């Protein structure tokens, strides 16, 4: 499957790529270096408190206040879900916004930063999905797409809903079969982000709007069990070698009936299963 062109990918500084301590910076990086659509967002600092009404004029009718803790992710661990995100909130309800803002900050640790993310709430969402580059918590090299079909944008991450559809695809596949075309948009965005960040262990949250257009809510490093890439490649090599050997042996011979060779590790133990001119 083709990856869309990423305008400034060749000029990216590795130090500017995947940020473990600031989800807002990751979104900003994607916005500036790709064509992936993102609901309008802004990183809010404590100094913005006094002119919050002016800032909110830039947003749609409702917003989500998302955590942006510097302790949420490190290069070894993740605290995904530990810190609050609150919404949707009417952007004109200033008192509730300030109250919710403080509640999100209070969920942080004492020596944490004091920023949050204000993001447009996607009203009338068709679905929300979490895409992971690998099966979480395992060595399994499977892309995982977990989707909830409904407007609850926290359905997958909150753990409060059980009607979630999971789709797995092995990382060795570069294209999706036609029958799985509903997942094309997820596959495409995941590839774009992995290439953009130069990182193939990502945790991505996507929502589809009322037009079924995918919108990126957040992207973060995928934490969990370290992927043992060498054993995976050894396993793949063994499979490839066996396939090659089978193709060499599949050619029919004059002393056997039929047009296809079928191999078994039991037929030599049961004469009744040995079919041919000379069962010896």
Describe every region a protein language model picked out.
Residues 36-59:
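N-terminal auxiliary "cap/dimerization" subdomain that precedes the catalytic jelly-roll/cupin core
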Residues 38-42, 64-67, 116-120, 204:
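General beta-strand structural signal in soluble alpha/beta enzymes
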Residues 40-41, 65, 69-96, 127-130:
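Glycine-rich phosphate-binding loop of ATP-grasp-fold ATP-dependent ligases
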């Amino acid at each position: 499957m083709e990856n869309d062109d990423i305008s400034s990918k060749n000029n990216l500084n590795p130090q500017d790529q995947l940020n473990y301590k600031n989800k807002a910076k990751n979104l900003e990086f994607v916005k500036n270096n790709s064509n992936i659509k993102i609901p309008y967002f802004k990183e809010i600092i404590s100094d913005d408190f006094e002119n919050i009404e002016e800032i909110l004029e830039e947003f749609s009718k409702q917003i989500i206040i998302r955590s942006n803790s510097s302790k949420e992710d490190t290069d070894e661990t993740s605290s995904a879900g530990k810190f609050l995100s609150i919404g949707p909130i009417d952007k004109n309800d200033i008192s509730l916004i300030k109250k919710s803002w403080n509640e999100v900050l209070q969920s942080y640790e004492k020596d944490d930063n004091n920023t949050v993310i204000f993001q447009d709430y996607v009203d009338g969402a068709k679905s929300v999905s979490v895409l992971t580059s690998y099966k979480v918590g395992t060595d399994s090299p499977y892309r995982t797409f977990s989707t909830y079909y409904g407007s609850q944008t926290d359905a997958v991450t909150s753990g409060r809903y059980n009607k979630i559809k999971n789709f797995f695809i092995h990382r060795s596949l570069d294209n999706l079969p036609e029958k799985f075309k509903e997942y094309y948009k997820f596959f495409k965005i995941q590839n774009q982000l992995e290439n953009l960040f130069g990182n193939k262990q990502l945790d991505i949250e996507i929502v589809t709007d009322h037009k079924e257009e995918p919108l990126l809510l957040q992207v973060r490093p995928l934490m969990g069990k370290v992927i043992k890439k060498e054993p995976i490649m050894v396993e793949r090599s063994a499979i490839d070698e066996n396939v090659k050997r089978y193709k060499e042996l599949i050619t029919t011979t004059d002393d056997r009936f039929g047009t296809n060779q079928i191999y078994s590790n039991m037929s030599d133990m049961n004469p009744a299963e040995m079919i041919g001119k000379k069962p010896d």
